[in-house]
Amino acid sequence: MAISKEEVLEYIGSLSVLELSELVKMFEKKFGVSATPTVVAGAAVAGGAAAESEEKTEFNVILADSGAEKIKVIKVVREITGLGLKEAKDATEKTPHVLKEGVNKEEAETIKKKLEEVGAKVEVK
């Protein structure tokens, strides 16, 4: 005589929590499966986004304000970007201005340091 699915469900429904836990362990052992829940896809995506933001490898160097020593800032901008005198002057007057795009963190910090030494305000994003 075969047992129906409904009879199995009735039997499982009549078990105590302890008996049900033992039954689950028996299923895991017999069939080589695990009853542990899997990670929710939404949580994995959110975690991945956080990891990406921590591992940013390309940065933009933005001249926020050229400060009082505009001539010194123009010289540094020319050195960093290779722009001509007029283009470098325009870049320092029209702030905020992106000086370098897609540079690594070390280069971005070096550029920021050089510009801040001559009085400019710089952002690295």
From Swiss-Prot:
Any GO MF annotation of the entry: mRNA binding
Cellular component GO terms held in the UniProt record: cytosolic large ribosomal subunit
Keyword annotations: Ribonucleoprotein, Ribosomal protein
Membrane-spanning segments: none
Coiled coil regions in record: none
A GO biological process held by the record: translation
InterPro entries the record matches: Ribosomal_bL12, Ribosomal_bL12_C, Ribosomal_bL12_C/ClpS-like, Ribosomal_bL12_oligo, Ribosomal_bL12_oligo_N_sf
Pfam families (alphabetical): Ribosomal_L12 (PF00542), Ribosomal_L12_N (PF16320)
Record note on quaternary structure: Homodimer. Part of the ribosomal stalk of the 50S ribosomal subunit. Forms a multimeric L10(L12)X complex, where L10 forms an elongated spine to which 2 to 4 L12 dimers bind in a sequential fashion. Binds GTP-bound translation factors.
Family to which the UniProt record says this protein belongs: Belongs to the bacterial ribosomal protein bL12 family.
Stated role: Forms part of the ribosomal stalk which helps the ribosome interact with GTP-bound translation factors. Is thus essential for accurate translation.
Stored NCBIfam families: L12
Protein name (record): Large ribosomal subunit protein bL12
UniProt organism field: Helicobacter pylori (strain ATCC 700392 / 26695)
Gene: rplL
